[in-house]
């Protein structure tokens, strides 16, 4: 007698009947796998993490969305001359959506895991991103609140010294425009602001930045720059002080005051005449009426430095 279980037709029916169960199991379970080499998820052109949408040529060479606009419809793959049009690589996009990796700031306290395609955007906004010391000759890095304590201990004598009081909402300081980097600090909230002057062929660019991660939950500040000489005035106002993780020498693309050469006394700027005023205001309303948070910067004696350090890092 022929075993009914061995009949090919019955076997086919049995396999088909198991498919709904398998589908149900996959819907009810979260399956995971370990990817040993994350480099396979990087764009072969810019070597940055692939982002959605991802495009491919007919041979399967892929390119990220940003590089796609730069390759002029030509596949960047080695030895490949096929056109790369609007053909999406949905298989890779699905991998990017499902591949979660921990933030690189895990060791500093971040507990978030994000999809691989969003790693770059998350780490730019992560509260635990590491900041660099605003002193250009120092390589120290740490969280933004640690950087404040480091700066006050190591570099206070190099900064623009300004006084501060709790409950006030604005800061007014005078800074010589010939200084490339001036650091303003406020002890109660442990804030570091950097005023930079970039001398270029046609004049000087002046910016104000705050040492802090660019996360939205940090308090916002507005600012006003003004420059006066021989009756001529240049002013610039911005509703928000941009945040940065590291001071650099790159000429700003936006949010700056420009002082043309016609208002400068040549390359060597006269300290007595060419002074700019910086006003920084906090967006949050304080309980006390807004007055000057910082007084105009004044020379500080050596015996005052240690007291200032002690009070500021308590």
UniProtKB/Swiss-Prot annotation:
Annotated segments matching region Disordered: 1-31
Zn-finger segments (SIAH-type): 98-156
Reactions listed under catalytic activity: S-ubiquitinyl-[E2 ubiquitin-conjugating enzyme]-L-cysteine + [acceptor protein]-L-lysine = [E2 ubiquitin-conjugating enzyme]-L-cysteine + N(6)-ubiquitinyl-[acceptor protein]-L-lysine
InterPro entries from the UniProt entry: Sina-like_RING, SINL_plant, Znf_RING/FYVE/PHD, Znf_SIAH
Binding-site residues for Zn(2+) 2, renumbered to this chain: 133, 138, 150, 155
Region (SBD): 95-280
Keywords: Metal-binding, Transferase, Ubl conjugation pathway, Zinc, Zinc-finger
Biased composition (Polar residues): 1-12
UniProt zinc finger (RING-type) residues: 43-81
Catalytic activity, EC: 2.3.2.27
Annotated Basic residues bias: 13-23
PROSITE patterns documented for this protein: ZF_SIAH
Residues bound to Zn(2+) 1: 103, 110, 122, 126
Any single biological process term in GO: protein ubiquitination
UniProt GO MF annotations: transferase activity; zinc ion binding
Pathway assignment: Protein modification; protein ubiquitination
Pfam families referenced in this protein's UniProt entry, alphabetically: Sina_RING, Sina_ZnF
Family: Belongs to the SINA (Seven in absentia) family.
Function: E3 ubiquitin-protein ligase that mediates ubiquitination and subsequent proteasomal degradation of target proteins. E3 ubiquitin ligases accept ubiquitin from an E2 ubiquitin-conjugating enzyme in the form of a thioester and then directly transfers the ubiquitin to targeted substrates. It probably triggers the ubiquitin-mediated degradation of different substrates.
The record's note on its domains: The RING-type zinc finger domain is essential for ubiquitin ligase activity.
Designated name of the protein: E3 ubiquitin-protein ligase SINA-like 11
Organism from which the protein derives: Arabidopsis thaliana (Mouse-ear cress)
Record lineage: Eukaryota, Viridiplantae, Streptophyta, Embryophyta, Tracheophyta
